[in-house]
Each structure stands twice: as structure tokens, then as C-alpha cells.
Amino acid sequence: MKITILAVGKLKEKYWKQAIAEYEKRLGPYTKIDIIEVPDEKAPENMSDKEIEQVKEKEGQRILAKIKPQSTVITLEIQGKMLSSEGLAQELNQRMTQGQSDFVFVIGGSNGLHKDVLQRSNYALSFSKMTFPHQMMRVVLIEQVYRAFKIMRGEAYHK
């Protein structure tokens, strides 16, 4: 089994990098995990709707170029389905039982995900109706993936 977190933009702050590294280490016994960053598109502050769509399209092309045809794509979206930690564990476990073994979680840029990425998605996941910094979302996501594996194995952690 392989998990990839595919995110737009780079982690800059040391504390986010340290948190990600800690969960990568913790996930080691359970699964292979890769973090792939694609460059965010530089854009002015006050963009028109057309310019926002162009930025999302360019970032979307970069995202799609990193996804293999056989990958199960889980996009993080405000409009996605909200799950409990147990629900995420159940969703991943069910998909693994069906033979899916290459999961790609996609975190878009500050303007969201392009429609082509959303169409490629096999599952839309939401952590909240609120907006979070993308760097923080990476840490929350990798922690929840770790928690899901602990739950799937029946190990103590999630309570």
C-alpha cells in the first residue's frame, strides 16, 4: 500500500516540516508515504474570476501530471464528505479490501482545485466547512491518515 500527499506549494516554516516528518516516521510501519509538492502559480492579490480560473488550471495541470492512472484520488474540498476518524479508517479499509492500494490525497492551492482535478477525483473529503492554511491542512491530513491506520489495526491512539 502506498499513500501520497500531493499538495500545491511548499512548506516553508520549520515547525510544519517537523510535524510532517514526525508523522512520516510514525506511518513507516504501516505504509509507504510520499509527499509531493507542485509549485503554486504566482498571482496578483486582486485577480478577476478569469485569472483565478487560469491559476487553478495551471496548478491543476501540475497536479494531474503527478497522478498515475491506477491511483485512487481523494481530493480535499470544502464541499466533500465529512467523516469521523473512524469513518476515514473504514473508507480506506473498504477501498483496500476492493484491491485499491495506491492512494493520492490532493490539497489544492489557495484558490482551490481546478475542475479537471475534481473530475479525476474518486472521493471528495472535507475536514470542515472552515478554511485552513494549506500548510496546517497537510499536518492535519497526515495525522488523520496515521490515526486511520491505528484504528484499522485496533491499536490504541484515537480515543
Curated annotation (Swiss-Prot):
It is an enzyme of class 2 (transferase). Keywords: Cytoplasm, Methyltransferase, rRNA processing, S-adenosyl-L-methionine, Transferase. It is found in: Cytoplasm. Disulfide bonds: none annotated. The keyword S-adenosyl-L-methionine applies. Changing E77A: 30% decrease in methyltransferase activity. Its main location: cytoplasm. One of its GO terms (molecular function) is rRNA (pseudouridine-N3-)-methyltransferase activity. Its EC number is 2.1.1.177. Gene3D superfamilies: 3.40.1280.10. Specifically methylates the pseudouridine at position 1915 (m3Psi1915) in 23S rRNA. Specific for fully assembled 70S ribosomes. HAMAP family: 23SrRNA_methyltr_H. This is Ribosomal RNA large subunit methyltransferase H. It comes from Staphylococcus aureus.
